[in-house]
Amino acid sequence: MGEPGQSPSPRSSHGSPPTLSTLTLLLLLCGHAHSQCKILRCNAEYVSSTLSLRGGGSSGALRGGGGGGRGGGVGSGGLCRALRSYALCTRRTARTCRGDLAFHSAVHGIEDLMIQHNCSRQGPTAPPPPRGPALPGAGSGLPAPDPCDYEGRFSRLHGRPPGFLHCASFGDPHVRSFHHHFHTCRVQGAWPLLDNDFLFVQATSSPMALGANATATRKLTIIFKNMQECIDQKVYQAEVDNLPVAFEDGSINGGDRPGGSSLSIQTANPGNHVEIQAAYIGTTIIIRQTAGQLSFSIKVAEDVAMAFSAEQDLQLCVGGCPPSQRLSRSERNRRGAITIDTARRLCKEGLPVEDAYFHSCVFDVLISGDPNFTVAAQAALEDARAFLPDLEKLHLFPSDAGVPLSSATLLAPLLSGLFVLWLCIQ
């Protein structure tokens, strides 16, 4: 349910052809993979099959003979054959590697390299490497990237910082999805905001007032799933008037594993604000309490957000609210003594741009009769300003009255392509 999928956008190439050090990093990156996951073997075979292309081979080997790439430069044929073999190996082990962040990073790295070198998906593959001594350079002293530092690990593998997504839920609740759709929802009871291989977030809502369609989030449950070498599974639960600065087990980090400090919880305003940092999956979460409701805001790495199966498709952060659960602004029912003009004036003080956040503020103030709802919308906008990688998408505007709010630009997000790729390897 939710918004229909959008066409994947092609990735832009970036960086220079991979060096031996970069290829070795592919091997090092996956050193923490689960024992049944064979991504370590896939990386070792790829590094081995490309050694002759890294300056030590003959000119014939560099040219690769046999057209692996379309218009590629020196070595493109041999490199394309190696990349196709690498991709085939990852597909064969995909089922046992599901949920392994290193595996997903390697899959996207292959895609990037194939695009950079104009490699076709169909064609000859590299012969299996001969069994023999350890790979040259495997023990060269190059430090392995920290498996619990997602941003650092990704940057070393891809030569660029990772992409991030933002989602928020506040007020009525209003949900801003990863794809910049903005919905006002009537969802009642427990609904998943996120449900992927690394993170589960559930919001529980109840009506703002007796007989009202609009609801407000009264409880948030967040599960950080067990990740080898980094964290034990941790559960955080917040309710109105109970915003703890600790996980359910009383801890404030990811546990006693080597990367336990890569998950932490802190506050700058006890009882009203909690921030959870999950560096091992490139994620920051902010939870606030305002006007008797809870607000949720997240910045999360693209690969993490899109690591889910078809059975996990109901996620408000991914598809927005299901059509049957959406409210239009025309459905508001004023409660209390606040007029529309007063509500607009109150919201305008902190939200000068009449965008989705402004209209959500007016909606909430009118339907609740509580001026404190202005704070929830203002905080959500500030989180978006801090979390969005592209500030041109900060302000979203209604397409017309009575229709759910959507992005003014209506650009197809690149993330659809990542999602399609994930489905293809299952």
UniProtKB/Swiss-Prot annotation:
Pfam families, per database record: RGM_C, RGM_N
Keywords: Autocatalytic cleavage, Cell membrane, Disease variant, Disulfide bond, Glycoprotein, GPI-anchor, Lipoprotein, Membrane, Phosphoprotein, Signal
Disulphide bridges: C148-C230, C167-C317
Tissue: Adult and fetal liver, heart, and skeletal muscle.
Modified residues (Phosphotyrosine): Y46
Signal peptide: 1-35
Compartment(s) of residence: Cell membrane
GO MF: BMP binding; coreceptor activity; signaling receptor binding; transferrin receptor binding
Spans annotated as Disordered: 119-142
Gene Ontology cellular-component annotations: BMP receptor complex; cell surface; extracellular space; HFE-transferrin receptor complex; plasma membrane; plasma membrane protein complex; side of membrane
InterPro entries in the cross-refs: RGM, RGM_C, RGM_N
This protein's record includes keyword Membrane: yes
Modification(s) after translation: Autocatalytically cleaved at low pH; the two chains remain linked via two disulfide bonds. Also proteolytically processed by TMPRSS6, several fragments being released in the extracellular space; regulates HJV activity in BMP signaling and thefore iron homeostasis.
One of the GO BP terms on file: cellular response to BMP stimulus
Function: Acts as a bone morphogenetic protein (BMP) coreceptor. Through enhancement of BMP signaling regulates hepcidin (HAMP) expression and regulates iron homeostasis.
Subunit structure: Interacts with BMP2 and BMP4. Interacts with BMP6. Interacts with BMPR1B. Interacts with TMPRSS6.
UniProt similarity note: Belongs to the repulsive guidance molecule (RGM) family.
Designated name of the protein: Hemojuvelin
Organism expressing this protein natively: Homo sapiens
Organism classification: Eukaryota, Metazoa, Chordata, Craniata, Vertebrata
